[in-house]
Amino acid sequence: MENAKMNSLIAQYPLVKDLVALKETTWFNPGTTSLAEGLPYVGLTEQDVQDAHARLSRFAPYLAKAFPETAATGGIIESELVAIPAMQKRLEKEYQQPISGQLLLKKDSHLPISGSIKARGGIYEVLAHAEKLALEAGLLTLDDDYSKLLSPEFKQFFSQYSIAVGSTGNLGLSIGIMSARIGFKVTVHMSADARAWKKAKLRSHGVTVVEYEQDYGVAVEEGRKAAQSDPNCFFIDDENSRTLFLGYSVAGQRLKAQFAQQGRIVDADNPLFVYLPCGVGGGPGGVAFGLKLAFGDHVHCFFAEPTHSPCMLLGVHTGLHDQISVQDIGIDNLTAADGLAVGRASGFVGRAMERLLDGFYTLSDQTMYDMLGWLAQEEGIRLEPSALAGMAGPQRVCASVSYQQMHGFSAEQLRNTTHLVWATGGGMVPEEEMNQYLAKGR
């Protein structure tokens, strides 16, 4: 972006100056509305989410047999919800900032099959595509026991079709492992940020991995191009896919059920604050949409991004969405948080969700490494760097009197708050890689 344009952008949006300087930045969204007001802009409904629930239930008998690690939950891919009181104390001590309420962790980092939040959306979209093909071919009815999809006849049928996706790592893992298990031929286009072990794991499942020297945007574009030339190839579009988004959104009702089991209340007097790491936006956008449908105006969602990849904050704050990239303002999009190394946000998610998100913030790689170490020490839970992005949220919210006043929170409401950090990945990181992460924390 030339200087004159840049100066006028900064004049209009002074916060951009802090992003360019790679400062850890917090922006509380003045444009938030009620769910009733914001929902029509999403373009999806409660019914769409119910349909996704139903589809995952139809596939549960198949998943329970195809992936024995899901048998205990009857083929439902869901993660634990745990309190992390020792980490809460550690954060208060490190940042000299009390965190009112209770701190919880949602362990999507340890979801079965692929060990990340992408096991929600990625697996769901592959299943939705497989179902569509099998229904159209007359091989399946909605009332069948879907475990029949494990038969050689279905493997043979699906092998005529292929799936392609562009990814920084975790989405590729989910889609690659699931597609290969069903019998699809699958190609994952991986950006320069992708970890070597993620590529190796995919190849061990018989997935074709195409590597690029460039970032996520290039990998997605190349994947899209390659798929266009083959009528039997289905491209999973992380930037625009409504299906992926709905796969994530199922988490809302699931979390509501977990809260009920644990006797946790979410209402006007007991608000819920949720902190979601954000890359291109599909995962956190879908989860936030599901949470809003489940908890209404009593849930407040925040997106967390690396200082080197603040694409969603930049897009929503300026209103330019996918018309601007972090590279346009001179930011390099290089971060240890490989799952969040995205320079241009999803235009679909930004426009759909901008009224339903309370805020956005950035944090440095070093902050993620520090918190990764603290969580391992205090709670014995090991995550990958990007999964710690949400952990910086509670103290930002608790430190901001202006945010609290903007929403009219009383001291009592804040005392009764549940802070939920969404841990997005790390359960499958090899030990030597994890030790390198731990060594970088202070």
From Swiss-Prot:
CDD domains: D-Ser-dehyd (cd06447)
Gene Ontology biological process terms in this record: D-serine catabolic process; D-serine metabolic process; detoxification of nitrogen compound; DNA damage response
Positions carrying N6-(pyridoxal phosphate)lysine: K118
GO molecular function, one term: hydro-lyase activity
UniProt keyword annotation of Membrane present: no
Domain of life, per lineage: Bacteria
Stimuli inducing this protein: By growth in D-serine.
GO cellular component: cytoplasm; cytosol
InterPro entries: D_Ser_am_lyase, Ser/Thr_Dehydratase, Ser/Thr_deHydtase_PyrdxlP-BS, TrpB-like_PALP, TrpB-like_PALP_sf
Catalysed reactions, semicolon-separated: D-serine = pyruvate + NH4(+)
Alphabetized Gene3D superfamilies for the sequence: 3.40.50.1100
Cofactor: pyridoxal 5'-phosphate
Record's keyword annotation contains Lyase: yes
Keywords, in A-Z order: Lyase, Pyridoxal phosphate
Known EC number: 4.3.1.18
Family in the record: Belongs to the serine/threonine dehydratase family. DsdA subfamily.
Subunit-structure text: Monomer.
Domain notes: Crystal structures show a large (N-terminal) and small (C-terminal) domain; the C-terminal domain is mobile and can block access to the active site.
Protein name: D-serine dehydratase
